[in-house]
A protein has these predicted regions:
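Bacterial Sec-dependent N-terminal signal peptides
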Residues: 1-22
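Glycoside hydrolase catalytic-domain context in secreted enzymes
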Residues: 19-501
């Protein structure tokens, strides 16, 4: 009996320290957890929360058992795993995922329930991969169709964007995965995106460009927001005092963490006092080679800590930033209600199909050609490079490594029967390259066009599948379209094909 009493006493004593650690108690009020954690942290530990420790993670506090934040792109699915310190693919064999429809497609459904379904499904994929934060969705306004990243946003209407963004965020965060709403704010072009200074009237600012963000803050209570590269009133938006401290945090009463876009931080004092909470992806201006990964040289790292220690910047500033990051950690990676999630489930594929079908926009059907009656056609010709191209490849941060891709040509051959469907490429689009255009031989373009026109003469039905293809200066990050025309001579090709039908 004596031995049993000793064992019971030992168990009870072991539990005593945890009982006094409010920050580790998931049932305690969030602000109590945050305050308790802050009271136990050193200045250096607080600063460490505020900047990257790898390409897509920010630090926790290992001494206290506070976990790091794992972030990842992107708006339409979980990006393939990258190496810890580089942009190189880690070449995992188990990181293939479901590629969800574009957010423009989601917005075109005008269906809040589908937006909720989207947020639920995509957050389950992120959770299964061990991610705490979706770097998305995006709700910048499509001021011009030339915007290279328009497909990542929800169109040109602020009301529609606001209505559709809320269910996505609410459903994702109900699963314990933070949304990092982007890009705040006024980021509606890729050209000169690091240096353009946006001029906008107060009315347009509030009624158009900020409106969907405000709705996400006030209705969905989004947990994190990503700053944008551009400037407003001459100050970079990732640390713009008026935009972040006065509008977002004071006027809208937002308590989340403001994350910089990768490389969007430019100044320690502005980052400290201008509302930035987590600095990601900064290049260290030659202080070290990028290959050495000088995370301690980030603007909100050692330079910021020195300003705290010498009294130049108040400890209150540091505590506010650290508190915002801790809230995000406790809401996500240290939230026992965060789902385990799933990857490439049939439910997720069904969600993609439902959203994709409802997001289709028919522009014209004057001859009632659609829906196609397969029994009417014996010789079907499919034309277009996009009939065989996977549009999950390329596009910058939205690029995906999808497990299951069905090309339009494959689907049409299944619908009509392989023996009835012929294919002509029609034009060559080249490789999807992030920062340059893959030049195509004009002679090759002429040969491909001639082949398609020749085959069209014998076809009962020609189906053209074209458009943009994730190439630079099309629908791709870091560049905008140069015209409204379809690239690679597609307009001319379509006109020739129409004459043959």
């Amino acid at each position: 009996m004596k031995n049993k009493l000793i064992i019971i006493s030992a168990i009870a004593l072991a539990a005593l320290p945890c009982a006094g650690q409010t920050y580790l108690n998931p049932d305690a009020p969030l602000e109590d957890r945050v305050s308790d954690a802050l009271s136990r942290m050193t200045t250096h530990e607080k600063v460490a929360l505020l900047h990257a420790q790898s390409k897509f993670t920010s630090a926790g506090v290992p001494r206290l058992g506070i976990r790091q934040l794992n972030m990842d792109d992107g708006p339409h699915g979980v990006r393939e795993e990258l190496e810890w310190n580089t942009w190189n693919a880690a070449r995992w064999t188990n990181d293939s995922i479901v590629a969800f429809p574009s957010l423009t497609c989601l917005a075109a459904t005008w269906n809040r329930d589908l937006s909720s379904l989207y947020g639920k499904a995509i957050s389950e994929e992120f959770a299964f991969r061990g991610k705490d934060m979706i770097l998305g969705p995006g709700c910048n306004i499509a001021r011009t169709p030339l915007n290279g990243r328009a497909f990542e946003y929800m169109g040109e209407d602020p009301f529609l964007a606001g209505e559709m963004i809320v269910p996505y965020i609410s459903a994702a965060q109900a699963n314990g995965v933070a949304c990092c709403l982007k890009h705040f704010a006024l980021n509606d072009q890729e050209t000169d995106r690091f240096s353009v200074n946006v001029n906008v009237s107060e009315r347009a600012l509030n009624e158009i460009y900020l409106a969907p963000f405000r709705r996400a803050v006030e209705k969905a209570h989004v947990w994190s927001i990503m700053g944008s590269y551009n400037l407003w009133k001459g100050v970079h938006c990732c640390h713009n005092d008026e935009l972040l401290n006065k509008i977002l945090k004071r006027d809208w009463h937002w308590d989340g963490a403001l994350v910089s876009d990768w490389g969007g931080t430019t100044n320690t004092m502005e980052a400290a006092l201008g509302g930035l909470d987590i600095e990601m992806g900064t290049y260290t201006d030659g202080k070290v080679k990028e290959s050495q990964f000088g995370y301690n040289l980030y603007y909100l790292a050692d330079p910021f800590e020195r300003l705290i220690n010498d009294g130049t910047i108040s400890m209150d500033v540091l505590n506010d930033k650290a508190a915002r990051v801790l809230r995000t950690i406790f809401r996500t990676t240290m939230n026992p209600k965060k789902v385990i999630g799933s990857q490439c489930s049939e439910a997720h594929y069904d969600a993609c199909l439902q959203i994709g079908e409802e997001g289709i926009v028919m522009l014209k059907n004057s001859r009632r050609t659609l829906p196609l009656r397969t029994e009417r056609y014996k010789r079907v010709l499919v034309v277009g490079d996009n009939a065989t191209r996977s549009l999950t490849k390329g596009g910058g941060s939205s690029e995906l490594k999808s497990l299951r891709d069905i090309t339009p040509l494959e689907a049409l051959r299944k619908l009509f029967g392989s023996d009835k469907v012929d294919y002509a490429q029609g034009y060559e689009a080249g490789q999807a390259i992030y920062d340059k255009v893959d030049e195509v031989d004009p002679a090759l373009q002429e040969r491909l066009k001639a082949e398609a026109i020749s085959k069209a003469k014998d076809a009962d039905l020609v189906i053209f599948i074209g458009g943009l293809n994730k190439n630079h200066r099309q629908d791709c990050e870091n560049g905008d379209r140069e015209s409204y025309d379809l690239p690679y001579g597609q307009n001319e090709l379509i006109a020739h094909l129409a004459k043959e039908q």
